[in-house]
A protein has these predicted regions:
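Catalytic domains of riboflavin
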Residues: 1-242
Length: 242
């Protein structure tokens, strides 16, 4: 029923839209997802026509800083703390900004390696979302999942996402998402499986430094100091060497 994370990564590399579903106890919704580097006007049009939700650009903090984007509210009181920034538009190369072509151009402009804040204007018709540094290991949201998949597939560090709605305006869930995926021949995966994939493939700690300490008259110990990549907290391993 659900595709493997490896399959989704392959789709991302090929520039094929896929679906990511979050936990039943969270939103329990599916988003159309694709690395931002693979976006074009046809994919934007598909999202707008068949996804029907808000088309957003998931980015990391470095990109948000390069674009000088501030959060939409100074105090985020949304239930899931989705990090919306002010909306954006490409400063050049667009007309009204809302067409599929214009929105694709805005996204391509925003993800350029050497982009600066002067290259975009605000407000606009693309809604950036800032992912947590730890990705889905820190927040199990579509924003983080889109950025994680982009990174894992070697397609940059940004993703385009769009919620999937039913024709009657309700949010597509469960069997509706499965049937939707079959209808459009899209692979569908769970964010919980992406979390498991990363936990299996990655180390969550890094060695910062090693020190030697002497305790008492003759006991010598090696002190290894590790840092948790998710929260920055340090952990110490004390090893007796003599």
């Amino acid at each position: 029923m659900f595709s493997s994370v490896k399959k989704i990564i392959q789709d991302a590399k090929r520039g094929k839209i896929f679906i990511l579903v979050d936990d039943k106890n969270r939103e329990n919704e599916g988003d159309l997802v694709i690395p931002a580097s693979k976006i074009d006007h046809k994919k934007i049009n598909f999202m707008a026509t068949h996804g029907r939700g808000l088309i957003c650009l998931a980015i990391d903090k470095n990109k948000a800083k390069a674009l000088n984007l501030s959060l939409m509210p100074s105090r985020n009181s949304s239930r899931l703390e989705t990090a919306f920034t002010i909306s954006i538009e490409a400063r050049k190369g667009v007309t009204t900004g809302i067409s599929a072509k214009d929105r694709a151009h805005t996204i391509k402009t925003a993800i350029k390696k050497n982009v600066r804040s002067k290259d975009i204007s605000t407000p606009g018709h693309i809604f950036p979302l800032i992912a947590k540094d730890g990705g889905v290991l820190q927040r199990a949201g579509h924003t983080e999942a889109a950025v994680d998949i982009a990174k894992l597939s070697g397609c940059g560090s940004s993703g385009v996402i769009c919620e999937i709605m039913n024709a009657d305006g309700s949010m597509a869930k469960g069997k509706h998402l499965i049937n939707y995926a079959k209808k459009f021949n899209l692979n569908i995966a769970r964010i919980e499986d992406l979390i498991a994939y990363r936990l299996k493939k990655e180390s969550l700690i890094k060695l910062k430094r090693i020190e030697q300490v002497k305790i008492g008259k003759s006991d010598t110990y090696q002190v290894k100091i590790y840092e948790n990549k998710l929260d920055g907290k340090e952990h110490i391993a004390l090893i007796k060497t003599q």
